[in-house]
C-alpha cells in the first residue's frame, strides 16, 4: 500500500471513528431516556405496589357506588312515604272531628224515633231537617253511613252484639241495627253494632 493510500485510509478511519463515537453517544442517550420512561417489569416491587393501590381504589369505588345506590333508594322510599302520609293526612285529617260528632248524629236519630208525629209535627219535621243537613255535611267530607239491616254480616264493617234465630231471615244476616256505623273514604271509623241471625 502506498503512503498516500495509507494516509487516506487513516484519515477515513479517523473520520468514521468520530462518527461512530457521536452515534454511540446519541444511542446511549436515547437508551437512557427510554429506560427512564419504561414501565417497571411485572415482578418489580413498584409495579406490585401500584397493582395493590389500583385494586384498593377499585374496591373503594365499588363500595361508594353501592352506598350511593342505597342512599338513592332510601331517599326514594322516604319521598314515597311522605307523599303517602300527606295524602292520608288530607284524606283522614277530619277523622277525630267526625268521630266526635257521631254521638250527636246518634242522639238526633234517637230523638226522631222517640218523637211522636201526632203530638208536635213541626218538632218532628225540624229534627228530620237537622238530621238531613248533618248527614249532607258529613257526605261533603266523604263520610258514608253504614246501615246494614237485611245485609249479610261483614266483620270488617259490622260488630255483632249477639246472635239469635230469626225465622224467615237468611242465616248470618243482620236482623237488628243497634247503632249505625260510619266510613271515612274507605276506612271504617265506627262499625255498625248489630244482631245477626243464626240458622
UniProtKB/Swiss-Prot annotation:
Q: Listed GO cellular component terms?
A: cytosol
> Corresponding gene?
grpE
Compartments annotated for it: namely: Cytoplasm
Q: Which organism is it from?
A: Legionella pneumophila (strain Lens)
NCBIfam families, from UniProt? PRK14139.1, PRK14140.1, PRK14144.1, PRK14150.1
Assembly: Homodimer.
**CDD domains named among the record's database cross-references:** GrpE (cd00446)
Positions with biased composition (Basic and acidic residues): 1-24
Keywords, in A-Z order: Chaperone, Cytoplasm, Stress response
Lineage per the UniProt record: Bacteria, Pseudomonadati, Pseudomonadota, Gammaproteobacteria, Legionellales
Is Repeat set as a keyword in this record? no
Q: PROSITE patterns attached here?
A: GRPE
| Swiss-Prot/TrEMBL GO biological process terms | protein folding
> What does it do?
Participates actively in the response to hyperosmotic and heat shock by preventing the aggregation of stress-denatured proteins, in association with DnaK and GrpE. It is the nucleotide exchange factor for DnaK and may function as a thermosensor. Unfolded proteins bind initially to DnaJ; upon interaction with the DnaJ-bound protein, DnaK hydrolyzes its bound ATP, resulting in the formation of a stable complex. GrpE releases ADP from DnaK; ATP binding to DnaK triggers the release of the substrate protein, thus completing the reaction cycle.
Region (Disordered) residue ranges read 1-52
The GO terms describing molecular function are:
adenyl-nucleotide exchange factor activity; protein homodimerization activity; protein-folding chaperone binding; unfolded protein binding
Name of the protein in question: Protein GrpE
- In which family does this protein belong, per the annotation? Belongs to the GrpE family.
